[in-house]
């Protein structure tokens, strides 16, 4: 019996390796759950183009939008786990379990995490010039007069909202959330001085920072941005446990063979090392971020748990 089991295990391993070696033998779909032209869409197209060149097979980017990015994710979660339907998503996919009452998938269980594409550092932005010369100054002002400081978001439970709440709770101050329909409107209100601060990825904010219309007080990622290296992290600014990462990453349906998951990881990693891809990702505000499938799966699971705790502490209820 022991020999039979050993032979079966060997055959299973050989089959998995053969499947991975044969993959891909037909076009692969890369599902983007948001609109064309977004950072997520651009990143998907840059990497998909390189994967096509590396593997000699077409990687077709499809935008399946709606419901805050959950429709595209649900489509992939329910797709055949054969490696031919890939999802690229963002930090938002780890927030959904805390903010959606009837989520059509389980982020931690319905996906095989492959690897991050990039980290996208979020900046704490204020109008320039501002009465708040530093993040510590902003927090001090908020504590001195509770309720006097407000911040913009693009909707309750969005990544910018969660980032602001992470900072607010760790620093211990009160602030009023003002939701807007989109990032351009939110930034306009900050530039006009009608809103005190706003969290935004470097890519979106950099032109206004360089033009002197906005000032970056800090970055909430664990490391400084290479695009704006003089801007301190929120930890460096003196606020422990205030870091919050924005990232973009790749996923497959949960039961995809591990050899295929590993093959895709290795090919994405290779693609990200190509000079053209590096340059394009950097131009879109992406910072290098690499994890193995196992590391990324663990990271995603911890992020889901952290966001649930954060939403509860901030009084954000599933809708």
Predicted regions and their residues:
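Sec-dependent N-terminal signal peptides
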Residues: 4-14
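Sec/Tat signal peptide C-region and signal peptidase I cleavage site
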Residues: 14-20
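N-terminal (or domain-start) structured segment
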Residues: 20-110, 148, 172-199, 208, ...
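An extracytoplasmic/periplasmic, membrane-proximal ligand-sensing/linker region
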Residues: 25-27, 169-171, 236, 258-319
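Extracytoplasmic/secreted envelope proteins and their assembly/folding machinery
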Residues: 44, 48, 52, 73, ...
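Hinge/capping helix and adjacent helix->loop/strand transition within the periplasmic-binding protein
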Residues: 78-84, 98-185, 234-236, 247-280
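A ligand-binding cleft/hinge motif common to bilobed small-molecule-binding domains
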Residues: 93-102, 168-170, 197-231
């Amino acid at each position: 019996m022991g020999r039979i089991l050993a032979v079966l295990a060997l055959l299973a391993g050989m089959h998995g390796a053969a499947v991975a070696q044969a993959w891909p033998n037909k076009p692969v779909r890369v599902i983007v759950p948001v609109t064309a032209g977004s950072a997520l869409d651009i990143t998907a197209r840059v990497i998909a183009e390189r994967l096509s060149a590396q593997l000699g097979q077409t990687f077709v980017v499809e935008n399946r939008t709606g419901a805050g990015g959950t429709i595209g994710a649900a489509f992939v979660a329910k797709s055949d786990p054969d490696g031919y339907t890939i999802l690229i998503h963002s930090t938002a996919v780890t927030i959904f379990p805390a903010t959606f009452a009837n989520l059509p998938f389980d982020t931690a269980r319905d996906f095989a995490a492959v690897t991050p594409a990039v980290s996208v550092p979020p900046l704490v932005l204020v109008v320039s010039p501002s009465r708040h010369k530093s993040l510590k100054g902003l927090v001090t002002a908020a504590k001195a007069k509770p309720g006097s400081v407000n911040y913009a978001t693009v909707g309750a439970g969005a990544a910018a909202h969660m980032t602001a709440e992470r900072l607010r709770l760790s620093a211990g101050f009160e602030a009023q959330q003002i939701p807007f329909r989109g990032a351009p409107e939110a930034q306009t209100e900050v530039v006009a001085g009608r809103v005190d601060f706003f969290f935004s990825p470097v890519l979106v904010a950099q032109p206004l920072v360089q033009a002197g219309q906005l000032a970056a007080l800090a970055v909430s990622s664990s490391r400084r941005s290479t695009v704006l290296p003089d801007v301190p992290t929120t930890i460096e600014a003196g606020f422990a446990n205030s870091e919050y990462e924005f990232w973009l990453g790749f996923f497959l349906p949960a039961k995809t063979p591990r050899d295929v998951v590993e093959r895709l990881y290795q090919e994405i990693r290779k693609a990200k090392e190509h000079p053209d891809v590096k340059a394009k990702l950097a131009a879109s505000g992406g910072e290098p971020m690499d994890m193995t499938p196992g590391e990324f799966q663990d990271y995603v699971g911890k992020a889901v748990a952290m966001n649930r705790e954060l939403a509860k502490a901030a009084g954000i209820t599933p809708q």
